[in-house]
């Protein structure tokens, strides 16, 4: 009997457990299996009557994309122009030796590089306009924007930072738009007056101060200043900055390639013109550095075919590749929707060659050797462009718009530019646009065949100058003009 009691006790101990290291038994529930409803092949919708399907919405789509013979006749591809007109660069240009000092300039600031009045120019400039509902904005809205701009705190933070995502740079600390007049061509969508520029992922910046509510910060990049969302930037210390600057630079040559970390998690999309610090070269990828939202320096991977180490000399292969990508772009006023306008297209095009250009059109037109078109007629302008212009190294400038000279084709001067539309004017004087809305290669007579073409605004007739940005500047008398983004 004693033996059986001992055995029973032993079994109880074994089954129930008595040691301190044993864990309680956990019974795992079998997860429920959820499946979506089955689709039924039928012409009868199962949606309730109060839901309007997209195809049932009755709207009249404006027919503004008229036929433009330039874009049909001339190749909308880089190969013909590169093969005919481009040369492989033999020696480094002086401008290419100064890329680093321009690119990293924001990290050298100890305080804001301009005064508060200059930074806050927009407060007095914008006191009326239309909002997202196309209704006039009340004066109280502008007063609130002035209050939120908090320029009493200008240059109070004085911190070096970096962009952790692609950002829209705004004139006011708000994502809401401001239109001059939605009823007039060129004064409504997409020309949001508050879209100042954009900031690339991992781009160096300097933080001046925060908005009154703290949701926005006023920053300086190497090419612009304005408001960005505070949660899109992080502050860096001196050790981090020096660590990033010491690395070789990786120049991105592809758009919209997913960049992932070592765990294959998405970090950002690639963008032509983006620069990343290089860590290592692997079999298929470049390993580069980025800063995450906690301010920690981490690694991501870039496919080898989407970047190159250091800036390259201007060459036909690279021109072909970059230009082909950029010709796919739709028009993006001030970088809206992560697209490009005229000046950002040219700026990004030349960045992989280690050439730094300013952001706005008027400033770009002052880089390098400037040749004025004052007192020249159209025939003389064409002759001068053919004589002096260097394909892919020359900018043609009219007020508010820049075009990259890509040489001649069938004896015509050809330009690559990202353009919103062709100006029109009917017999009653009503102005309009034939929407192009993308990057194109055209002559300087683009749109001359369009109905009601406004000949007074033809590209060739309105050209003011040309500048070879790879050549050293020469002193000339030039009228100062405040730069504006293009809305051609």
What do these predicted ranges mean?
Residues 15-17:
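C-terminal motif of bacterial Sec signal peptides marking the signal peptidase cleavage site
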Residues 19-21:
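Bacterial signal peptide processing site
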């Amino acid at each position: 009997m004693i033996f059986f009691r001992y055995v029973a006790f032993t079994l109880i101990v074994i089954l129930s457990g008595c040691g301190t290291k044993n864990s309680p038994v956990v019974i795992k529930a079998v997860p429920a299996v959820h499946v979506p409803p089955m689709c039924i092949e039928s012409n009868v919708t199962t949606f309730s009557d109060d839901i309007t399907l997209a195809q049932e919405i009755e709207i009249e789509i404006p027919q503004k994309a008229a036929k433009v013979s330039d874009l049909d006749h001339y190749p909308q591809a880089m190969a013909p122009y590169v093969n005919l007109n481009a040369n492989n660069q033999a020696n480094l240009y002086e401008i290419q030796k100064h890329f680093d000092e321009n690119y990293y300039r924001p990290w050298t600031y100890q305080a804001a590089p301009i005064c508060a009045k200059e930074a806050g120019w927009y407060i007095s400039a914008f006191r009326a306009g239309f909002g997202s509902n196309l209704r006039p904005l009340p004066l109280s809205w502008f007063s609130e924007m002035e209050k939120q701009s908090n320029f009493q705190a200008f240059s109070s933070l004085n911190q070096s930072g970096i962009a952790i995502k692609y950002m829209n740079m705004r004139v006011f600390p708000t994502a809401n738009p401001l239109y001059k007049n939605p009823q007039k061509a060129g004064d409504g969508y997409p020309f949001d007056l508050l879209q100042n520029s954009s900031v690339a992922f991992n781009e160096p910046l300097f933080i001046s101060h925060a908005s009154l509510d703290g949701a926005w910060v006023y920053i300086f990049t190497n090419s612009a200043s304005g408001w960005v969302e505070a949660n899109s930037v992080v502050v860096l210390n001196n050790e981090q900055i020096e660590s990033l600057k010491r690395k070789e630079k990786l120049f991105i040559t592809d758009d919209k390639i997913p960049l992932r970390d070592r765990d294959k998690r998405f970090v950002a999309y690639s963008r032509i013109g983006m620069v990343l610090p290089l860590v290592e070269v692997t079999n298929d990828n470049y390993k580069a550095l980025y800063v995450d939202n906690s301010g920690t320096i981490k690694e991501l991977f870039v496919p080898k075919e989407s970047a190159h180490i250091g800036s390259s000399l201007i060459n036909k292969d690279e021109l072909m590749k970059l230009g082909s990508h950029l010709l796919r772009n739709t028009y993006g006023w001030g970088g809206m929707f992560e697209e490009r306008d005229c000046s950002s297209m040219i700026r990004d095009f030349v960045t992989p060659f280690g050439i730094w250009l300013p952001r706005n059109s008027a400033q770009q037109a002052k880089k390098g050797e400037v040749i004025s078109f004052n007192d020249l007629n159209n025939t003389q302008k064409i002759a001068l462009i053919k004589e002096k212009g260097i394909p892919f190294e020359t900018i043609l400038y009219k007020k508010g718009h820049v075009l990259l000279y890509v040489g001649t084709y069938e004896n015509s001067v050809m330009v690559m530019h990202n353009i919103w539309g062709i100006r029109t004017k009917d017999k009653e004087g009503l102005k309009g646009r034939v929407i192009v809305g993308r990057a194109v290669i055209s002559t300087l007579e683009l749109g001359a065949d369009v109905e009601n073409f406004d000949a007074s605004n033809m590209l060739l007739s309105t050209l003011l100058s040309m500048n070879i940005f790879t050549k050293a500047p020469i002193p000339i008398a030039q009228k100062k003009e405040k730069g504006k983004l293009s809305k051609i």
